[in-house]
Amino acid sequence: VLGHPAGLFVLFFTEMWERFSFYGMRVLLILFLTAALTGDNPGWGWNAENAGALYGTYAMLLYITPIFGGIIADKYIGYRWAVVIGSIIMTLGHLFMAFDTQFFMYLGLGCLVIGTGFFKPNMTSILSEMYKAFPEKKDGAYTIFYMGVNAGAFFGMMLCGYLANNVGWHYGFGLAGVFMLLGTLQFWLAKPLFGTIGEVPTEEGRLAKAAAAKAELKEGEEDKPNPF
């Protein structure tokens, strides 16, 4: 499709729906926490300091868990299973947040942190492996991929924000979960398009990767001109 493997567009839409749900939820979180306890669309009535502290903690953890998710995928379960597991956990997280209760809000945020750890580093790992045979197309592939990121962020903030403001907070959070579920299902159904890319790693595969990385490093060092 457009000179690229069909798997690229599976990743495009999976990432787009994930970013839709992420940014759709993110744009609501602090507004919901700081909204008045009374009125047509009540929130939790937190002050800005406490709401910012919760959001900051959540954002910090989002950058920590991908380290562990990448290690687990690389050594044990493979990139594809990591994406599936992460997608399912994130879907549950968004749906939990739609209940608007303190228990489910914290449970949902915890699921999003864990799910992102599995999902985020391994999507781009699949994309990178897909283009090993034709690296000259990789730049174009990443451009298309990040168009999905931007499109998902734009529509997520707009639609979830509109629904939360005009219908109710839980509908906005729930819409994020619906689109995350959509991304999960389309990735699962399209798995055959990836062939062996991102499968559960074997010892032979790990050794081959290590050898290839060593060869690339050696080749790069040989190509460098001697400055002396």
Language-model segments: which ranges?
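Intracellular loop-helix junctions on the cytosolic face of multi-pass helical membrane proteins
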Residues: V1-V10, A133, G161-F228
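Central cavity-lining transmembrane alpha-helices of secondary-active solute carriers
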Residues: G52-A73, K120, F154
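Cytoplasmic membrane-interface "Motif A"-like loop-to-helix N-cap segments
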Residues: K75-S87, F134
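Short amphipathic helix-loop junctions that connect adjacent transmembrane helices
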Residues: V27-N50
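Glycine-rich segments within core transmembrane alpha-helices of 12-TM secondary carriers
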Residues: L62, K137-N165, G172-G183
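Hydrophobic core of transmembrane alpha-helices in multi-pass small-molecule transporters
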Residues: M16, G93, F103-F119
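Intracellular juxtamembrane helix-capping segments at the cytosolic ends
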Residues: F118-K132
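C-terminal ends and interior cores of transmembrane alpha-helices
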Residues: V84-Y106
